């Protein structure tokens, strides 16, 4: 892999900090009941996304994930204001306010969700890769999942067919240590999730998911293999989430001391340290980035607050092809 340049570190710092503050803002407005339903935040796992985006071809590669999905579409190029609006349930959101937290989509930016069913996105990711191979698009699908998803039957069925058909897909487990509140140690007789790929003779391995460089190195090789029609790869990103599984999680299954140990290797702090040690930016320039990030998050909040809610007819437009709803027994008001 080529040497990581100064501008990449600065971009990583600004992007990851923005994602962190974006999620923090969502937590704040959720408590104010401005965002409803479930809310699963990405705090701590930013290095996985940063490293992935660095080696993807954003003009043709795809991304699909589960419900911890707010900042991924932003990384793929979706306007963060529209993402924030979607969580508010506003019509200016990515799914006209109908999807909410767990169902953010952008066909234009090749971000295919946002799925609320554990493991439900895995067969879809392979299906998209099948389509790209069939039409010879030379595109690669990055299919993200949590550590809990690997206990679903669809995971194993998909890996089997993906390897059989040599599909251009990279399966990425973001192992943050817990499936909701259940430790990885309590779900199987071993904790090396990456070894599940061995049963399908699929290239696989563990990756330091708290370091964007390590993530980029592993994914660069996997994406190259997929694009060269050599088949899929299965990677386990060993990462950590600083917040609970969702906002309703009391986190009684872990200690504050455990969380603080992982904060010592915070991906944002690691990148900031490299920047300062190599004089890639001064303290003042770092402060300017912090100020810009704060301003951007406030702009997203303002946009979401001021956007209108969808009209009732939008619900039907999203489901039915016909414009005349006479077949519906009640009238729209």
Regions found by a protein language model. Name each.
Residues 73-75, 181, 245, 314:
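Short acidic, gly/pro-rich beta-turn/loop elements at beta-sheet edges
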